[in-house]
């Protein structure tokens, strides 16, 4: 790297010197040499890639180094999957959680972001999709599978609650802009899961009060025929609508009939 810097300084200072041709030839060889890039890649840090870009401007692998820097700063999980830089597996784990595993497919650490509103789309038409209720960020430091624990709620209210046999793919939600505004207000309000779930269903499903009644809890000892206890009652529904209203979301479909 010192040679390349010295050559640049020489060419800047003596653009018509006797050794310009040799200097340019040497510089071209340095900018085509993979060794400095591979050294930065092996370190796998923002500092290493930044130093490489500073020492070797115009290097043939400059674009790869800049891409790696962006990956280390943090990228949307959907973009990383689409660019085949990470692999993700996910399956159902009830109404409040989704089991997610991820691994990197590139030879350096990757910081993945799962933004609010990201959808986990069920492979089964009978199971609900899941939606992120808070942004999560994870660093994949090795090429082994790592378990992630994102905060989610269910969408597509009429469908079944996902179980371990239901797998998901990841994509951006068509409601993502509204959810990005809504969920920080939900978090700030410090409300429980029933209110959070109600708020999400209002956004993703235009749910009214009767619709929200489908969320029930059933004691473990209860018989199969037992209908369960409604979780989203008037207080939870009203609180969810208040938060949606604060977020500027149309709640005219939420009726108390």
Q: Where are the regions that the model predicts?
A:
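Short solvent-exposed coil/turn linkers within tandem alpha-helical repeat scaffolds
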Residues: 11-25, 53-64
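Intrinsically disordered, low-complexity Pro/Gly/Ser/Thr-rich segments with frequent PxxP/GP/PP motifs
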Residues: 119-166
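Disulfide-bonded cysteine-rich modules in secreted/extracellular proteins
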Residues: 1, 32-44
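Low-complexity, acidic Ser/Thr/Pro/Gly-rich terminal tails and inter-domain linkers that flank the onset
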Residues: 70-93
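Asparagine-centered strand-capping/turn motif at beta-strand->loop junctions
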Residues: 17, 90-92, 96, 100-114
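Buried hydrophobic-core signal for structured, non-transmembrane domains
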Residues: 10, 52, 100-102, 200
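Mature extracellular/secreted ectodomains of secretory-pathway proteins
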Residues: 147-148, 155-253
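TPR/TPR-like alpha-solenoid repeats
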Residues: 27-30, 34, 69-72
């Amino acid at each position: 790297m010192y040679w390349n810097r010295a050559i640049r300084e020489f060419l800047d200072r003596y653009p018509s010197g006797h050794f310009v041709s040799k200097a340019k030839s040497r510089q071209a060889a340095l900018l085509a040499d993979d060794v400095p890039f591979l050294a930065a890649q092996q370190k796998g840090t923002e500092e290493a890639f930044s130093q490489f870009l500073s020492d070797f401007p115009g290097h043939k692998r400059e674009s790869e180094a800049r891409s790696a820097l962006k990956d280390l700063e943090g990228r949307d999980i959907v973009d990383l999957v689409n660019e085949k830089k990470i692999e993700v597996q996910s399956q159902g784990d009830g109404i409040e959680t989704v089991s997610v595993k991820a691994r990197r497919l590139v030879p350096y650490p990757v910081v993945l972001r799962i933004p609010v509103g990201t959808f986990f789309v069920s492979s089964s038409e009978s199971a609900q999709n899941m939606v992120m209720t808070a942004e999560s960020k994870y660093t994949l430091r090795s090429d082994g599978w790592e378990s992630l624990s994102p905060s989610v709620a269910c969408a597509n209210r009429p469908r079944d609650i996902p179980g371990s046999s239901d797998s998901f793919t990841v994509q951006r939600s068509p409601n993502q802009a509204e959810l990005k505004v809504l969920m920080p207000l939900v978090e700030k309000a410090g409300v429980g899961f029933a209110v959070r779930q109600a708020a999400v269903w209002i956004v993703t499903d235009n749910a009214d009060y009767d619709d929200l009644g489908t969320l029930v809890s059933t004691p473990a000892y209860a018989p199969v025929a037992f209908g369960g206890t409604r979780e989203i009652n008037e207080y939870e529904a009203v609180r969810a609508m208040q938060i949606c209203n604060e977020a500027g979301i149309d709640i005219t479909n939420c009726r108390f009939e």
